[in-house]
Amino acid sequence: MSAKKPMALVILDGYGHRETQADNAITNANTPVLDGLMANQPNTLISASGMDVGLPDGQMGNSEVGHTNIGAGRVVYQDLTRITKAISDGEFQQNETLVNAIDKAVKAGKAVHIMGLMSPGGVHSHEDHIYAAVEMAAARGAEKIYLHCFLDGRDTPPRSAENSLKNFQELFAKLGKGRIASLVGRYYAMDRDNNWERVQKAYDLMTEAKAEFTFATAVEGLEAAYAREENDEFVQATEIKAEGEESAAIVDGDAVIFMNYRADRARQITRTFVPSFDGFTRNVFPAIDFVMLTQYAADIPLLCAFAPASLENTYGEWLSKEGKTQLRISETEKYAHVTFFFNGGIEDEFEGEERQLVASPKVATYDLQPEMSAPELTEKLVAAIKSGKYDAIVCNFPNCDMVGHTGVYDATVKAVESLDECIGKVVEAIKEVDGQLLITADHGNAEMMIDPETGGVHTAHTNLPVPLIYVGSKAIEFKEGGKLSDLAPTMLALTDTAIPAEMSGEVLFK
């Protein structure tokens, strides 16, 4: 069998691009190899943060998200951005599970109940999503829309719910129908440690309107809780019902939509609506259509609006199906990233996939050994390139990120310089076997060592772009405006391999 000419992807973890020279461990390092590549080889900048990698706008990238996007060949949206995007492009409003539950209740003259963490925190839920759900129910003809508000105070300031409640009161006034039906702190409604006596308070509040307190408006109920020295998180079960209004308890035939997207604190309260539940004795158990926004657990037999997105035909899986061989190689610190995360959350190797792990050095902090295990990793990588065994190789060098996180500037400069030497050897090996190489990063870090806002040490990732450099015999010209999810289709195109339909990323050369 003839020797294979590998397509290698080298990810310099934490190697971002920043024009400013000040406090930039990358531009201030002595890097003749990388400088030469930038001067003489096709190169461009690609995005590694925010919506381009499925994160909220402006949010810095991270290694897990970065490698998932690279391996998937498509933008992988986190639940928050996935739902936000679905709302903005109309997919949410057309969601079959939500539409059916609402329409069934409307047809029967029943209520649509919407429950969830009423918060702009964006950790477990987002109030913008709840707002959209209320508007959707109204648009589909629901007359009775009842909002059961779980109050935050953990991912938001301890007493910050008033603004959210006022916004919803205004929305209902504008719609001319629906109302806030109940308030309770997340301490009760979102317990995750089997404190069922807490969860029961929230369940009884929603199914029986059983409450310690009743007030005519949500803001009055909240003010009373504050007067009792209860912060948002700990607000006791409070029914919101003005004189003459009918009860907003959940009854047979109603639809209930739970708008939290994060599973861990949504599971317990959701399980109370499952027939087989035995955590406490339920006084009433209404026959309803209950919709989870996302899947909170595979064993909860309730409707789900947004099923987990499974990543079919990632780069690794596709190469395997095409009968190709591949190697994943890194140090301990980033080994999971080039394997588990790169494979879309799959632990096992695909057929034809091999893995090599180089132990990261045993030092207290990596500024003490900025080269980490790069020399040994390079030796193994060069041997793999020359072995003729692999069609594709994915390697991560952790230095810029791991040393960058220490905040020690001089050590981070040394880390960059040690990598430059390593890249020189990798390029040489690729040229020797007539292979191809892409050098990039999953996110930035080392290019900003001092926070320009505070003047303090900057140890976090950045939201800056990352370089992409091509080494190989093809005369290519890169397009502008790429992102991490474009790398897999680009590598497949460079090796004249078919690109699976699931990969919505673009080929980055003209």
UniProtKB/Swiss-Prot annotation:
EC number(s) reported in the record: 5.4.2.12
Native species: Aliivibrio fischeri (strain MJ11)
Cofactor needs: Mn(2+)
Transmembrane segments: none
Keywords: Glycolysis, Isomerase, Manganese, Metal-binding
InterPro entries, per database record: Alkaline_phosphatase_core_sf, BPG-indep_PGM_N, Metalloenzyme, PGAM_B_sf, Pgm_bpd_ind
Protein name (database record): 2,3-bisphosphoglycerate-independent phosphoglycerate mutase
Binding of Mn(2+) 1, residues: D401, H405, H461
Annotated Mn(2+) 2 binding sites: D13, S63, D442, H443
Gene Ontology CC terms: cytosol
